[in-house]
């Protein structure tokens, strides 16, 4: 089953869709994989963790699919902690070295999505070692926001958090959100 996720993500769709806001794509994910997201969110895909590929697929479902399925709602971030733990375990095991650079970039995304400065220091090391300029650049941009605010201000409204005046000013700047 996890092969379906990886085939879809890395073979079937174009990379431009990975981070694009597209309602049709979000609906497609919901139709094809909504039930898998539900199982992953409930912790029911533990069997996938027997291989690094299965773990990567579960991370993609929890981290990336959540953002598409529940765009603009608190649920879009609801599985970030679980995805981060799975990614940390895969890295600790050393098995992630078997993945392609592109796949490892997605395994590392829960680090980039974290609002922890400590986790971002680890993310910076991971993306530096990965040696993919675009992904490293994105991590540097994410880390700068966490270093400055301790959180992602663009999530404040979604999560019901009050923005500080400095965050409000930042949010008015072009490119302040992801």
For each feature predicted by the language model, list its residue ranges.
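Intrinsically disordered, low-complexity activation-like regions
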Residues: 1-57, 61-72, 77-178
């Amino acid at each position: 089953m996890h092969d379906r996720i990886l085939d879809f993500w890395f073979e079937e769709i174009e990379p431009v869709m990975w981070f694009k806001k597209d309602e049709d794509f979000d609906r497609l994910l919901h139709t094809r994989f909504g039930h898998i997201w539900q199982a992953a969110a409930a912790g029911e895909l533990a069997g996938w963790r027997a291989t690094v590929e299965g773990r990567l697929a579960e991370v993609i479902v929890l981290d990336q699919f959540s953002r598409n399925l529940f765009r603009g709602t608190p649920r879009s971030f609801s599985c970030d902690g679980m995805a981060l733990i799975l990614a940390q375990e895969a890295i600790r095991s050393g098995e992630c070295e078997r993945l392609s650079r592109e796949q490892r970039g997605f395994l590392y995304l829960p680090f980039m999505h974290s609002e922890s400065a400590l986790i971002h220091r680890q993310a910076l090391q991971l993306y530096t070692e990965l040696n993919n300029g675009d992904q490293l650049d994105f991590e540097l941009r994410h880390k700068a926001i966490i270093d400055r605010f301790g959180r992602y201000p663009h999530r404040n409204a979604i999560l019901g958090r009050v923005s500080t005046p400095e965050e409000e000013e930042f949010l008015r700047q072009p490119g302040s959100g992801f």
